[in-house]
Amino acid sequence: MFRGVYEHQIDAKGRTSLPAKLRDTLVGAYDERLILTTALDRCLHAYPVREWEALELSLAKRNPMEPGVKTLMRLYVASAQECPLDKLGRLLIPPTLRSYAGLEKEVVWAGMVKVIELWSREGWAKAQEEARQEATSADVMKVLAELRQA
């Protein structure tokens, strides 16, 4: 499971290092490949290939003309690109994905259980502030209570 928040630099070529703890989880449970795609928030999602393929298989069983399915395919699947780690544990983020998420000099990696989010530093700060405002909502508290009982 991916967890934790890590700040890293991104170089002029668009490479950034996958944080060691996230890399250990990736290599230990999967392999050294990630699928990067645009998220609905202004960030990127990084899936281990096996998790991504499971998502695609589930999606393939759905009616592609269903509005939510078609939109998900256009926004999420069509943008997806496989990005293997190099020998130094770096990931080359394609220019279109960097542009979408506003990744320039600093990136924030956020472990989200089965997926990793990549944010610009500013985007992450804004998302955290929004999450803190929502954290007091009844819906969030209900989910947390359900998880504690499971």
From Swiss-Prot:
InterPro entries: MraZ (IPR003444), MraZ_C (IPR035644), MraZ_dom (IPR020603), MraZ_N (IPR035642), MraZ_sf (IPR038619), SpoVT-AbrB_dom (IPR007159), SpoVT-AbrB_sf (IPR037914). GO terms for molecular function: DNA-binding transcription factor activity; transcription cis-regulatory region binding. Coiled coil: none annotated. It is found in: Cytoplasm, Nucleoid. Disulfide bonds: none annotated. Residues 5-51, 80-123 form the SpoVT-AbrB domain. NCBIfam families: division/cell wall cluster transcriptional repressor MraZ, PRK00326.3-4. Belongs to the MraZ family. Forms oligomers. This is Transcriptional regulator MraZ. It comes from Myxococcus xanthus (strain DK1622).
